[in-house]
């Protein structure tokens, strides 16, 4: 009788990003074309830029991005192509947990895998959703009072009318989680809490 084998499927970096714990790939995502195809948004020197498709002219939207407080390359265009949304990220030193896959199906030698794993009390990455008007460069950044104790915040998504972004917020300790609407004209408000 053959022994039963236990197979453990480890998350890929993309899956880990969904939990808000892995932020390295937020620096290197591909440029994003606007819905009307007139612009491309991208990260350069830790800041958000847009480039006109027709002329190649670049315009810097954010001015305060640094290595220790940078803008995510996961940029979302509003459906009307007038604004972009992203998150400003304060990264932290990461801790990892390691797993040994003792009997991989594709080779004889064991494989070592690692996954980012913050311990209780460790500082976590901090994200602030933000909106930039492409034409004027005007920025709208919410007060972080309502989500200062974040475990994670997802990348913002635009509502179909281009008037607000929605993001998921999970409080550290998981006592509070929900979706938030951020309207540039108003404060952030909880939805479905």
Stretches found by the model and what they are:
Residues 30-39, 43, 74-83, 155-165:
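Blade-terminus and WD-like Trp-Asp/Gly-His loop motifs, strongest in beta-propeller folds
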Residues 22-25, 66-73, 147-153:
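Short glycine-/Asp-/Thr-/Trp-enriched loop segments that recur within the blades
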Residues 133-141, 146-171, 184-186:
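Long hydrophobic segments that form regular secondary structure
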Residues 5-6, 13-18, 61-64, 68-76, ...:
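Predominantly five- to eight-bladed beta-propeller fold
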């Amino acid at each position: 009788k053959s022994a039963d084998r236990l197979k453990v499927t480890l998350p890929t970096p993309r899956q880990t990003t969904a939990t808000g714990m892995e932020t390295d790939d937020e620096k290197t995502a591909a440029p994003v074309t606007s819905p009307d195809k007139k612009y491309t948004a991208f990260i350069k020197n830790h800041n958000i830029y847009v480039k006109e498709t027709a002329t190649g002219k670049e315009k810097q939207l954010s001015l305060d991005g640094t290595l220790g407080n940078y803008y995510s390359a996961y940029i979302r265009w509003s459906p009307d192509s007038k604004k972009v949304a992203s998150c400003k990220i304060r990264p932290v030193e990461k801790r990892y947990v390691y797993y040994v896959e003792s009997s991989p199906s594709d080779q004889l030698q064991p494989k070592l895998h690692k996954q980012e794993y913050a311990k209780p009390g460790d500082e976590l990455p901090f994200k602030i959703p933000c909106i930039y008007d492409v034409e004027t460069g005007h920025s709208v950044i919410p007060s972080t009072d309502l989500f200062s104790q974040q475990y994670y915040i997802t990348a913002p998504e635009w509502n179909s009318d281009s008037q607000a972004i929605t993001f998921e917020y999970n409080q550290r300790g998981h006592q509070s989680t929900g979706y938030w609407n951020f309207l540039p004209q108003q404060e952030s408000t909880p939805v479905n809490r």
